[in-house]
Amino acid sequence: MYYNFVDIEKKWQKKWLEEKAFAVREDESKKKYYVLEMFPYPSGNLHMGHVRNYSIGDVVARFKRMNGFNVLHPMGWDAFGLPAENAAIKRGVHPNDWTWSNIDNMRRQLKQLGISYDWDREVATCHPDYYKWTQWMFLQLYKNGLAYKKKAYVNWCPSCATVLANEQVVNGVCERCKSVVGKKDLEQWFFKITDYAQRLLDDIEKLKGWPDKVKVMQQNWIGRSEGVEVDFKVDGMDKAVRVYTTRPDTIYGVTYVVIAPEHPVVKELIKGTEQEQVCNEFINKMMFLNEIDRTATDVEKEGVFTGRYVINPLNGDRVPLYLANYVLAEYGTGVVMAVPAHDQRDFEFAKKYNLPIKVVIQPEGQELDASRMTEAFVEVGYLVNSAEFDGVRSDEAIGKIIDYIEQKGYGKRKINYRLRDWLISRQRYWGAPIPIIYCDDCGAVPVPEEDLPVILPTDIKFSGVGESPLSTSETFISAPCPKCGKMGRRELDTMDTFVCSSWYYLRYCDPCNDKAPFDKERIRYWLPVDQYIGGVEHAILHLLYSRFLMKVLYDLGYVDYDEPFTNLLTQGMVLKDGAKMSKSLGNVVSPEEIIEKYGADTARLFILFASPPEKDLEWSDQGVEGCYRFINRVWRIVNEFADAVKEGGNIDTSTFTKADKELWYMLNNTLKRVTDDISQRFNFNTAISAVMELVNSLYYYKDKVADDSKNKALVREVIEKLIIMLAPFIPHATEELWSAIGKEGSVHEQKWPSFDPAALVKDEIEIVVQINGKVRDKIVVPSDLTKEQVEERALNSEKIKAETAGKNVVKVISVPGKLVNIVVK
């Protein structure tokens, strides 16, 4: 019987869809399992990274269903974003039309893969029924003081006269017109994620099922540090600059202070000084550099003297105040004290600008000479030139000096975070409108919840230049003030797409609710997500924002959990020729081409077999062909044994021949391995490998055992369990094979089989016999022999007796159940 994957896959996809085979409802009598892959941006076509992500999730979903769980496995679309707007500018296609056309195509491709989604729960973030509730989320944060507006620097293209997202700035120039991009200070909306910094950090401990690397990335991004803020008075002005440092033990070694060029006080400090012009030129230069270009360790340190000096409150030293590229206003206070003797960055800057270097920490038993130093000393040592703290170990001096600073009123202890508030404003059209109306009398007024959604207008001119595209809509701009009724102006910014994706996992639980974003009882049943799957590139922003929003909703009483994802799997990339697939490299493999040539089951099997899920996967055409051949082998042997399966009775192990026992052992050993590999480790590659070994054993049994000696009951057991074990990996072929052996219903509705522990205890085992570490024989012995009895059998083997004749046996080393090594001279 020919394996006609084209007809088979179409047949079962149609049947699953018509019968809503994977639709699910809350059922308190069953244990729930929520498996979720990160939803895609609808770019137009699936790529192999998508196939890998969704195939992994589908194995988990199907396996859990077969283990009796009530499985929620939904899919949707992260549908707002810049590409749709660029399509409108370049091709004259409205973002809405472009997006929905792409969604239709990608949905079709997903169905081609046979992923077991509950399509009744499909969501798209660009649909008003969805972004109504994104706007509702904004209002909850706004009402509770967690959404606010302030001025912030944004990327600005002077040629396009528009704000650019970071993604639109490539090597410092606008990707559209290639003009040099600068910075502009504009009013922007923020979410106050910094209020949750410590909780987000502390609760990383709860994330037992997350990869360590992701947890470390989040810890570093939040970036908690303990230090002290100290005020350095500006000489000749009634003003001070506030320094934040985690190294107060070095404060007596400050020889200059650095302030960020964009710090709000800089303009006042330089005004009227001889350095004003050169400082302004430097400030303008810094505006055209991004954070990475300024702060990377390999970037040359640059700065200019402000013409001002500041006073170190601890020793009265008058030190110069510099602007420098490596200090950012967003971090700490935007001002740092420079101790070149004990900080490498400061050391390099001091050498470049011929600034003093003052040693205040000496290594034990040595004496540093500042004039001869070639690098900063950053290890633990003992304080010198530090007044009353001389002789104190530097790590012990930190706390003592902070106490002294507080006692003297020079400053105070401070915990700082690298994490900044979440800037959500986008001067874009294709995003969720921010539900705020500006009234000349009432100020910024939130749109009432009953008036949501604020719908995106359609009368938009997409030029790619000027202000937000929403400003071109005459129907959108004007709106009555919800407080006083006078005509006001709508907010023209839209929300960052990360806002939409920070709560979508909640909407899946209740996607058709038009009264609320979700029903609390349904959320209580399904949440948290048991298994989340996606790329490590989302380790920080998306996952951190989702955790933040969940904690806000928890604090407001809308949910009962404050962490959204119990377990996280970050799958590796799909590579070809050692590089990530990309059009520019010409190494892209189209999923549709593979499906057309080999079928979806082959594509899935290869992507799951070629590598553990968390590792990168190297594409191999030969590997794909090998997986196709394996499915054909399974297809042939199941169909050859189909009649025997239908005739097979109940298993009676007491009648087993030696060949029967070997096949029975292989079946149960495979069941154990596959179950453990899927449920405990997600090692799908080794699970598939185990099934391949079972298929080899089945072929051996078919070829070596005469037809009239074959145990039909055993064959039936092996074939049935083989099909069930393969079902999560190759769902279409196994449905067809299940039907071919005369079974009713779907294979995916079958109970996952358990193994028989007794079957894993062999009556006989094979022992490798070595002489001086080299294999010389293999013997079969009863499994219940003692160590001494096995060694005796090994020494009495005819081959071993011949090899050791005339030699002195020095000792015998045994590894129970595996080998005997005889050492001779």
Swiss-Prot record:
GO cellular component, as recorded: cytosol
Keyword Cell membrane assigned: no
Protein name: Leucine--tRNA ligase
Enzyme Commission number(s) from the entry: 6.1.1.4
Intervals of motif 'HIGH' region: 40-50
Family note: Belongs to the class-I aminoacyl-tRNA synthetase family.
PROSITE patterns attached to this UniProt entry: AA_TRNA_LIGASE_I
GO biological process terms on file: leucyl-tRNA aminoacylation
GO molecular function: aminoacyl-tRNA deacylase activity; ATP binding; leucine-tRNA ligase activity
Localization annotation: Cytoplasm
Reactions accelerated catalytically: tRNA(Leu) + L-leucine + ATP = L-leucyl-tRNA(Leu) + AMP + diphosphate
Residues noted as binding ATP in the record, renumbered to the chain: K583
Enzyme class: ligase
Motif ('KMSKS' region): 580-584
CDD domains: Anticodon_Ia_Leu_BEm (cd07958), LeuRS_core (cd00812)
Database matches in InterPro entries: aa-tRNA-synth_I_CS, aa-tRNA-synth_Ia, Leu-tRNA-ligase, Leu_tRNA-synth_edit, M/V/L/I-tRNA-synth_anticd-bd, Methionyl/Leucyl_tRNA_Synth, Rossmann-like_a/b/a_fold, tRNAsynth_Ia_anticodon-bd
Keyword Aminoacyl-tRNA synthetase: yes
Keywords: Aminoacyl-tRNA synthetase, ATP-binding, Cytoplasm, Ligase, Nucleotide-binding, Protein biosynthesis
